[in-house]
Design a protein with these regions (language model features):
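N-terminal Rossmann-like dinucleotide-binding module
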Residues: 1-48
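Active-site loop of classical SDR/Rossmann-like NAD(P)-dependent oxidoreductases
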Residues: 16, 36, 226, 266-279, ...
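Glycine- and charged-residue-rich phosphate/anionic-cofactor binding loop of Rossmann-like
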Residues: 29, 284-302
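A contiguous active-site-proximal alpha/beta segment in oxidoreductase catalytic domains
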Residues: 99-158
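Contiguous beta-strand/loop segments that form the cofactor/metal-binding neighborhood of enzyme cores
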Residues: 171-250, 275-289, 308-310, 322-345
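Hydrophobic residues in well-ordered beta-strands that form the structural core
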Residues: 14, 54, 71, 94, ...
Length: 345
């Protein structure tokens, strides 16, 4: 039997998720396309053959013929829609962030704990990227010795004029926060963020984080790199390293030059990760066995707590502690990072 999915939000991410579900995920049925923009929803619904097209998300997630909800609406709606979907008995995959603030994320966690079962997952798709997977396996297999540090950079082509350094930390960097925590298996304990002033565009933000396991993580977020979308990472161990480079799709040789082209945004780079994540989500629902790589609501909270500390650090220029609340029993046990190293009391 197919898992009947309602996709809420038909912007860039929502439309991509809907296409992935219809073309690349056996066992998924696109039951509802929902967006406040009815024209856009109808165009996508007709294109993909959705059974229903709606403009009211609460109507979409409360339907008896919907088993699961994929939320890709504006960030400010995520918490309320996730809670409503849970209370309607649905499974949820929510694009990051699960909520814009830790307080709203706690509301989601409290609602899920009242249910007594995990129904919420967060779209940290890099956990399914084959390159990051190889990096994590190399560390766990002891191929590079003990993990010492991770270097990261996250570069986008351009950002709007209103995009701030605080937004770079809260909107862009959470992918690095999550994947480094996932690979290292250790919680963050402190962070410092710096940014040089810029006259013409938002300047890069640089973050350094310390983990409970004694590792250092650094992250460059540059949202005006101009040349293309580029994400790279290096895991440094005591006896070696693992280097995640930009994938080369094609190299053009002409006029005495060799040119490598970069993607314009993140979707081509992480196409496999999105596809594998969505497959894992649907398979977990249909088989009743969750893929341990899927990020849960607690993982969503952890990324937001780091981001909030990072924003304070950027504003004050000082190291900031990262909050580390006790993990509820619901989020302990069978998961990929169940052995996370946590700060000492």
């Amino acid at each position: 039997m197919s898992v009947r999915v309602a996709v809420i939000g038909t912007g860039v991410m929502g439309a991509d998720h809907a296409r992935i579900l219809t073309s690349d995920v056996p066992g998924a049925a696109l039951q509802v396309i929902c967006d406040a923009n009815g024209t856009r929803a109808r165009e996508l619904g007709d294109q993909l053959g959705a059974a229903h097209v709606l403009t009211d998300p609460l109507e979409a997630l409360s339907r008896a013929d919907v088993d699961a909800v994929l939320i890709a609406s504006p960030d400010s709606t995520h918490a309320d829609l996730t809670i409503a979907a849970m209370e309607a008995g649905k499974h949820v995959l929510c694009e990051k962030p699960l909520a814009p603030t830790s307080q709203d994320t706690q509301r989601v966690i409290e609602a899920e704990n009242r249910l007594g079962e995990r129904r919420v997952h967060v779209g940290f798709m890099r956990r399914f990227d084959p390159a990051y997977g190889a990096m994590k396996s190399a560390m766990e297999d002891g191929l590079v010795g003990d993990a010492l540090m991770m270097h990261n950079f996250h570069r986008n082509v351009t950002a709007p004029e209103w995009f701030t350094g605080e937004m770079a930390i809260s909107n862009s960097a959470p992918h690095e926060f999550d994947i480094c925590r996932f690979v290292l298996g250790s919680e963050y304990v402190s962070v410092i963020a710096v940014q040089m002033p810029s006259k013409n565009a938002i300047a890069p933000v640089f973050l350094v984080l310390k983990t409970a396991g004694g590792q250092i993580v650094n992250i460059e977020v540059n949202n005006n790199a101009a040349y293309g979308y580029d994400v790279r990472c290096e895991l440094v161990g005591s006896t070696g390293s693992v280097d995640l480079k930009a994938p080369v799709h094609a190299t053009y040789n002409a006029s005495l030059k060799s040119v490598q082209r970069f993607d314009a945004d993140w979707r081509p780079r992480f196409a496999d990760a999105y596809r594998l994540q969505n497959k894992a989500w649907i398979n977990g629902i249909s088989r009743g066995a969750t893929d341990p790589r899927l990020a849960n609501a607690w993982d969503g909270l952890c990324s937001i707590l780091v981001a909030e500390a990072g924003v304070v650090s950027l504003q004050t220029g000082t190291w900031q502690p990262v909050s580390s609340p006790d993990v509820p029993a619901l989020y302990q046990g069978a998961k990929a990072n169940s052995s996370l190293i946590v700060p000492a009391e």
